[in-house]
Amino acid sequence: SAGPQIATTTGTPAPTQAPAPAYPALAVNTPSTASNPIGLPAAALNDPMSRDIARELADLRQNTIPFVRGDVGIRSRDGESGLSELTELGATLSVAVSPFDEGRLTVTARPVSLDSGTPEGDGARRFGLNALVPTTVTESNYQALATIVDNNAGVWNLLTPTEKQILGAAITTPDATTLTDFVTSNPTVVAALTDDLRTAITTAVAADAATTLSSFVSDNPTIWNDLTTAQESVLSAALAADSYSFDTARMAALRRAPPQDDAGVALALAYEIGDIKADAGTTPLGFEVQNVVGGVTYAPRLSETTTLKLTGERRAVTDSLLSYAGTVEPFTGKRWGGVTRTGGRVMVSDDDGDVGIYGGGAYYRLEGDNVDSNQQLEATVGAYIRPYKTERAELSVGVNLSYLNYEKNLGEFSFGHGGYFSPQSFYSVSFPVEYTGESRSGKWNYTIGGAIGYQRYEKDAAPYFPTDGKLQGILEDEVSAGLISSAYYAAGSESGVGGNIHGGFDYAFDRQTTVGASASFDSFGDYSESSVMVYVKRLLEVAP
């Protein structure tokens, strides 16, 4: 066995709940003696009593033997570069002792490196405050943009001098060329005109020295009749200078989307004794946003086959770099992200060795730096059977029903969002299967499993800036002016078949040294996530 998992703030397993993915993986709640994601009991009532007693004594000895454990792993999540895409590299070093000759105290350090890439294209537009940068500036709406800028000078002063020059070019009304200036600068063109037109020019200037070239040409269209091609080009260029002209593509240079990466070291201290497990620690020190995390689990047996599991915890949300490590909004320099989930979970399960059932629910409150607060509700129920079971192997087959609800859709990456999957409703029915076994020598233990099922989620429309009414108001003004298309992320839904496959093994070199590895892959729609981990564990004493 790899030893007990202690709670961490990374993508590694925690005592109660793995982090929710950007699109949820199927719930693989197929319990077994080797792998049991929700802690269901696995009483082997059909084994001889002597074997039960021997195993219980062995477990007690194992729970107090000190050990050192190290692992290295990688987690990769598909998504948009700089936003939902994520590659996590991590290594864990754990030391466990039994200071009071009962229970186990485990100290863990975990270096973590995250890389999300660089926001690009439309992804850059939806990052931070970049949605404020107009996408369509034309002759019909540039004056509305000028008014918005004047009314919100504090926001636009966040631009660099170079960026302000681009914005200034977008909102500047061109100076009209006067008729007097054109005549003075282009005597050859004037000389080619008829006497009547030259007289008309003199009369117009005498009446109003500020008469513009464009108004004169509009009143005297015959001016084009006597010009050469070259002279027509001169007149056309002078008139064009009077017209508003701006390349909207230049506005993209105002967006700021730096590479998204971070690294740090998470620390954790855990203690387990009897039915109680407790841990406390930090998200990686060195991350932009750092949090204290931890939890307590109490899992008493209500009968020989029934277990109650109560959990209170505060955990990091590891869906994305934004939700996990946090980042810096590039215009304001404000820290943003680093979301934690705080709440509790209740699970009840019954397992007679052949058939098991379970059910429970959870409530969490989610908060982060400059991220709108949120609430999460969960419910799950399921059952399983073991159609095949021997002394060294067993097959579990089950069905799982899950429901998930978040108060708000905060799954985006503009300022105020948290970058984590948060649908207003999510339903899943899945059919997990898992096979576990042990070699005759007892040196090998292995698990392989998977699940397939149907999932559906729905999410509400969400404002780009849920924590800042002023910024959201600017966006809505820009929508009214036709400068951008929307100030809200659209509501949406998705349904379909999802799947999961996972496996792992342990190999005992001797009575003190064990190595192992595990891998998993989840997929639903465009979402997929994979992970691989290898470990080595060394007992510091030989079991008697």
PLM region descriptions:
Residues S1-P544:
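Gram-negative and organellar
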